[in-house]
């Protein structure tokens, strides 16, 4: 009986102790909860959507003949600016307002020994020093080489010219010989501004086709013109022909017929040169033709006609809503800066839809009297526009083309 009583007392003691411990734990837990602040529920972390492409725009300035040989070289070497001399007033044309400048380089660029300016003037065999290119590339994005002087140092000189341009990162297109079909047109990678859906912009590259045609000594063949069609089903095309009689205010029928053929062949714009004078313009089938832009950087000084020129201010734009493949085109544009690249094949293989670009045109006047090119005065610009018949032509342009 005594043993049973002791067992019962021990069991009761254990039960009481356990109850006390449980109660103590409860008190401690309540105290801890009371002391701890209640943490609010954390909101779910969301990543804002990436902005999408809304539009693309590129603003170009296209000039006429550019040349730094002969007397320009003499003036440069006599100046403080040396190789920068031909370009030292180009800031007047507000380069920062443009994505690219494109012009006609009317001279082979070689390291060949140079003759005197008098001999070069007599023979009209041009040869320009590559020492000017580091300065030229600060301004010019691309050159056409389709003219009557790029062969003046032979085919080797033309090949060396391309090599020097490659080394400086300047793009080019066209050939002295219009029957070398593979050299006529080139897909250029041109800087562009990409508008995004959040209202910001970024830099991009837009692939556009430029075709150069030399037609001074013979009109390029129908087969040569047909090269445009290889590209125009996919790309917007700008043609820069070099042809026609010199020192004339109007094109002859042979020239106008050829320029019409370029539009008929698929070109969206035709911007000509060679006559050393500004010539008239035309709206042909809703497309702009400028028959001659005139001398931009050149050493001719003998009258007002050869010292003035027109540069075409050209803005090309497209909205994403009108271009289902716009991002793919921008990606392609990053790959098109090399000469004879495969951008046409890439666009074909990807089955891209041709960009329906809107064109807006304006005119900037230049004057190189006083042995240096500079911006034309308002009066000079008005005279240039009258020669171009600019207002009438722009009024005639319809559809996607507009201007001022």
Residue locations for each model-derived region?
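N-terminal Sec-pathway targeting helices
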Residues: 2-22
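A short C-terminal boundary segment appended to hydrolase-like catalytic domains
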Residues: 42-43, 53-55, 250, 305-404
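N-terminal catalytic scaffold of extracellular/periplasmic and nuclease hydrolases
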Residues: 45-154, 161
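Active-site environment of divalent metal-dependent phosphoester hydrolases
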Residues: 69-71, 109-112, 148-162, 179-185, ...
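Binuclear metal-dependent hydrolase catalytic cores centered on His/Asp/Glu-rich metal-binding motifs
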Residues: 73-88, 123, 187-240, 246, ...
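Short acidic, glycine-rich surface-loop motifs adjacent to enzyme active sites
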Residues: 98-111, 147, 207, 231-250
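Active-site-proximal segments of metal-dependent phosphoesterases and phosphodiesterases across multiple
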Residues: 112-135, 235-267
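Conserved beta-sheet core of the metallophosphoesterase superfamily
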Residues: 139-142, 253-312, 318-322
């Amino acid at each position: 009986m005594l043993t049973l009583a002791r067992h019962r007392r021990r069991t009761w003691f254990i039960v009481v102790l356990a109850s006390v411990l449980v109660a103590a734990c409860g008190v401690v837990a309540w105290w801890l909860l009371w002391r701890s602040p209640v943490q609010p529920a954390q909101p779910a972390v969301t990543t804002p959507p990436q902005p999408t492409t809304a539009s693309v725009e590129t603003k170009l300035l296209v000039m006429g003949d550019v040349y730094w040989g002969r007397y320009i070289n003499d003036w440069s070497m006599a100046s403080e600016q040396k190789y920068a001399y031909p370009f030292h007033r180009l800031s007047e044309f507000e380069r920062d307002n443009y994505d690219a400048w494109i012009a006609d380089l009317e001279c082979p660029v070689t390291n060949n020994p140079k003759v005197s300016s008098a001999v070069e003037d007599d023979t009209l065999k041009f040869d320009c020093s590559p020492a000017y290119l580091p300065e030229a590339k600060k301004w010019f994005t691309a050159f056409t080489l389709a003219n009557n002087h790029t062969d003046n140092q032979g085919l080797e000189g033309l090949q060396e010219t391309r090599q020097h341009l490659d080394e400086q990162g300047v793009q080019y297109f066209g050939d002295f010989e219009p029957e070398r079909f593979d050299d006529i047109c080139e897909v250029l990678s041109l800087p562009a501004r990409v508008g995004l859906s959040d209202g910001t912009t970024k830099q991009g590259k837009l692939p556009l086709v430029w075709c150069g045609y030399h037609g001074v000594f013979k009109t390029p063949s129908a087969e040569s013109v047909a090269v445009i069609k290889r590209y125009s089903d996919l790309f917007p095309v700008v043609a820069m022909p070099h042809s026609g009689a010199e020192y004339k205010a109007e094109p002859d029928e042979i020239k106008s017929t050829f320029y019409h053929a370029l539009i008929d062949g698929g070109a969206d714009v035709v911007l000509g040169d060679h006559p050393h004078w500004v010539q008239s313009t035309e709206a042909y089938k809703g497309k702009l033709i400028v028959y001659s832009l005139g001398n931009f950087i050149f050493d001719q000084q003998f009258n007002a006609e050869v010292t003035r020129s027109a540069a075409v201010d050209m803005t090309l734009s497209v909205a994403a809503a009108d271009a289902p493949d716009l991002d793919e085109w921008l990606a392609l544009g990053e790959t098109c800066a090399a000469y004879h690249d495969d951008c046409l094949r890439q666009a074909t293989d990807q089955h891209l839809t041709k960009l329906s670009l809107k064109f807006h045109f304006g005119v900037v006047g230049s004057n190189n009297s006083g042995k240096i090119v500079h911006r034309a005065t308002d009066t000079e610009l008005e005279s240039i526009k009258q020669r171009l018949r600019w207002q009438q032509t722009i009024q005639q342009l319809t559809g996607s083309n507009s201007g001022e």
